[in-house]
Amino acid sequence: MNTAELSRVCRQVRRDIINMTANAGSGHPGGSLSAVELMVSVFYNHMRVDPQNPKAENRDRFVLSKGHAAPCYYGVLAKVPGIDASTGSLGQGCSIAVGMALGAKLQGKDTKVFAMLGDGECQEGQIWEALMSAAHYKLDNLTVMVDNNGLQIDGSNNEVMSLGDLAAK
């Protein structure tokens, strides 16, 4: 998909986010809006998915660990259906994605797993345990993305608990 088409999809997803959160009278539009470009790019340019066959066995998988970005995810899913996992508390999605990637690798499948995390949830120890497992098992079929927007529900990350140089970690 070219840049103009991606921009059009991003604008529509942003409209969907605002409509969903406004109509619900609830939600976290900021955390969804900060994830739009990354999620749209992954679904439309990097993942192997077929909207006509969303349960295809050989499709790639996506795990949204950053649950506050669910309205963004729903906006993307309107055109590219298929939820591979529902996550609970922040930090659990990374472990789920590692398990999916390891399972695919052990079964010899050509499946890639993509996980989107929020930078605030990277303060959770479970994230780092999952990432150590991914490195140990050499999960080259796993892509973990962090929406590094500098904010979480309690304030700025630096005020709550600085992550330091996240890219270096």
Identify the residue ranges that each predicted region occupies.
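N-terminal amphipathic, basic-rich helices that act as targeting or association modules
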Residues: M1-A70
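Alpha-helical support elements that line or immediately flank enzyme active sites
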Residues: C72-K79
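Glycine-rich ThDP/TPP pyrophosphate-binding loop and its adjacent helix/strand module
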Residues: V49-K55, R59-R61, V80-K169
